[in-house]
A protein has these predicted regions:
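Active-site segment of metal-dependent pyrophosphate-handling enzymes
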Residues: 62-97, 111, 208, 218, ...
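Conserved Nudix-box catalytic region and its N-terminal flanking loop in Nudix hydrolases
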Residues: 19-59, 145-155, 180-191, 203-247, ...
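Acidic, metal-coordinating catalytic segment for phosphate/diphosphate chemistry
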Residues: 1-10, 158-202
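Nudix hydrolase/Nudix homology domain
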Residues: 101-159, 179, 225, 266-277, ...
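Residue-level signal for well-ordered, solvent-exposed loop/turn and beta-edge residues enriched
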Residues: 18, 69, 148, 168-170, ...
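Short, well-structured hydrophobic secondary-structure segments
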Residues: 44-82, 192-195
Length: 342
């Protein structure tokens, strides 16, 4: 199929905590067939985005807009030959009487329930950006031709995409953006690497160990300023756990090691919900846990400022006690820490 580009508007009208949604069920050859979307349509000759917006809303709903906001440009690449530059609006003022739409069924839907409808996965990204009142943005969404999200970028910068997992740890086939996954509590995969070193012996000649903790940056989206695993990170869609662990070590701490230096401990399932920066954060992860016992040269550490504020060596048993007693500000799962000590 030959590719072609189109200009369009897309508007989400809001009233009483609800969006006016259009269930696209009429057209047979519609890229949005059976999806729920906002109202809008393609530009006519010589129209500005606002002129197209006002005309399309009037034609599809019967309403005349009196207050609206231009939120951003969404570049939609369907993967089957359709590329569309959507001018995204929200509107909170309108007048007139509702009219039936010849492209599907119109329904006022609670904004919280919109996420549960049959919508494009990438639409959840711009719903999140709107909800967080992000300034005017450019969002690019690329699909695989079968409705699956392949890539997303915000203002020219790639966004993190995760493979979403079933409860048994297998992949669902769904790919979801990081912020959306943490809003919905979607199960995804991570890597956790603990760095330990000998710290002498204690009574009975039992070997003592120290563990390296990182202090999370104050700008992190969860648990800012807390002590955490030596190195940790999400697996991007398609990533292999061991390769992801090696990458995170280099990015966060500036450490280059070989795959043979990482000893696999097992998998850990962890989840929590808590508010950060005024928004609820819902983490739900399946972590691949590794341990490094090789002596590392601390002088070679190069901390990634956006992720890591500082690092701290602490004797393992002392750390375990302080985690249990809550005297160490941390976001470490106690049962995972026990895995490291076994």
């Amino acid at each position: 199929m030959d590719s072609h580009a189109a200009l369009s508007t897309l508007c989400y009208m809001e009233k009483d905590g609800k969006y006016l949604m259009l269930h696209r069920t009429v057209k047979k050859h519609d890229v949005n067939k059976d999806k729920w979307i906002g109202v809008g349509g393609h530009f006519e000759a010589d129209e500005s985005p606002e002129e197209c917006l006002l005309r399309e809303v009037r034609e599809e709903t019967g309403y005349r807009l009196t207050s609206w906001r231009f939120r951003g440009i969404v570049t939609f690449v369907s993967g089957d030959g359709v590329t569309e530059y959507m001018h995204l609006f929200t509107a909170d003022g309108f007048e007139g009487e509702p009219a039936a739409c010849d492209e599907g069924q119109l329904e006022w839907v609670d904004i919280s329930r919109v996420w549960k409808l049959n919508i494009w996965e990438g639409d959840k990204i711009f719903f999140r950006l709107i909800d967080e009142d992000i300034p005017f943005f450019s969002l690019k969404l690329v699909y695989n031709g079968s409705g699956g999200l392949v890539s997303a970028s915000l203002n020219g910068e790639p966004m993190e995409l995760f493979d979403i997992l079933n409860e048994d740890g297998t992949k669902t086939g769904l790919v979801r953006e990081r912020g959306v996954a943490h809003r919905e509590g979607s199960l995804h995969e991570t890597v956790h690497t603990w760095i330990v070193r000998p710290a002498g012996t204690c009574d009975g000649e039992k070997k003592r160990w120290e563990v390296l903790l990182q202090k999370r940056s104050a700008v992190k989206d969860s648990n800012p300023g807390c002590y955490d695993i030596s190195s940790a990170g999400h697996l991007a869609s398609g990533d292999i756990p061991l390769e992801g662990a090696l990458r995170e070590l280099e990015e966060e701490l500036g450490i280059r090691v070989s795959a043979e230096d990482l000893h696999y401990v097992g998998k850990h399932r962890g989840s929590f919900q808590a508010p950060f920066h005024g928004r609820m954060f819902c983490d739900n992860e399946l972590s691949n846990v590794y341990v490094i016992t090789r002596q590392l040269d601390e002088r070679a550490f190069a901390l990634q400022e956006s992720e890591v504020e500082s690092v701290l060596w602490m004797e393992y048993e002392e750390c375990r006690t302080r985690i249990h007693e809550g005297t160490l500000p941390n976001c470490i799962y106690e049962d995972e820490f026990d895995m490291v000590g076994d």
